[in-house]
């Protein structure tokens, strides 16, 4: 049977169908929970696009960073203009964490990584469904928590093993964690975390409700 041939960097190779030879590929798509016509698309080459009309027209809103991968996109459940991106460059031997945030539909971006270990590249970011500005970040070496919209991050490992976090989902006041090689974990009842997000860090003692 005759095999299909394709050319990469001017050298013919056999397309074995595994997909490793494919690049500039859409890697993540996120629909806004506020408007079904607003959709974000991120690619494995770092490009980000947005459509405001259900896919008829797209605009390039790529952050001004070196080439990397858009690993996940999360639209804020509280503000339709706010979106978070987990961006990484580990394939370029850059393991720094990149949590990107835009508050204007991707017109401008800012990196938020204060407190995240320098070699813990980020795979996923989610905002809490109840508390605005309460963020969870899944990294290559565990989970981080931010109570101030990403300005500062704290390690939130608890009894979770040191393992890559591949996805996060807030579901019915629980945080569901998908890991690479260690199964699924669930942080049951986020109520104390919601309460903690309202506590000033200047207070030495806080009594939680029981």
Task: Indicate residue ranges for each PLM-predicted region.
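A short loop-to-beta-strand structural motif that recurs across blades of beta-propeller domains
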Residues: 47-50, 57, 97-101, 108, ...
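Short, solvent-exposed loop/turn segments at conserved positions within beta-propeller repeat blades
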Residues: 91-96, 137
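Short, small-residue-biased leader/transition segments that mark boundaries at the very start
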Residues: 3-8
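Conserved blade-ending motifs and adjacent loop-strand segments that build the rim/top face
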Residues: 10-19, 23, 64-71, 113-126, ...
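Recurrent small/Gly-Pro-centered beta-turn motifs in extracellular repeat architectures
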Residues: 43, 86-88, 139, 179-180
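Short coil/turn segments that connect the beta-strands within blades of beta-propeller domains
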Residues: 36-37, 80-81, 132-133, 173
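Repeat-solenoid scaffold signature
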Residues: 1, 128-198
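Conserved beta-strand position repeated across blades of beta-propeller domains
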Residues: 30-32, 74-76, 126-127, 169
């Amino acid at each position: 049977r005759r095999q299909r041939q394709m050319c990469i960097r001017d050298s013919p190779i056999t397309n074995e169908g595994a997909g490793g030879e494919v690049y500039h590929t859409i890697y993540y798509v996120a629909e806004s929970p506020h408007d079904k016509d607003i959709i974000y698309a991120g690619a494995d080459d770092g490009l980000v696009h947005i459509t405001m009309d259900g896919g008829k027209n797209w605009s390039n809103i790529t952050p001004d960073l070196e080439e990397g991968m858009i690993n996940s996109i999360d639209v804020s459940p509280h503000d339709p203009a706010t979106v978070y991106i987990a961006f990484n460059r580990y394939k370029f031997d850059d393991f720094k964490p990149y949590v990107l945030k835009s508050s204007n539909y991707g017109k401008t971006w800012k990196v938020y990584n204060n407190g995240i270990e320098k070699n813990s590249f980020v795979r996923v970011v989610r905002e809490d469904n109840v508390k605005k500005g309460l963020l969870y970040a899944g990294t290559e070496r565990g989970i981080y928590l931010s109570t101030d919209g990403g300005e500062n991050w704290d390690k939130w490992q608890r009894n979770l093993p040191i393992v890559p976090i591949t996805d996060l989902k807030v579901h019915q006041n629980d945080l569901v964690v998908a890991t690479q090689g260690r199964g699924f974990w669930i942080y049951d009842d986020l109520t104390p975390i919601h309460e903690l997000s309202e506590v000033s860090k200047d207070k030495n003692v806080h009594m939680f409700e029981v």
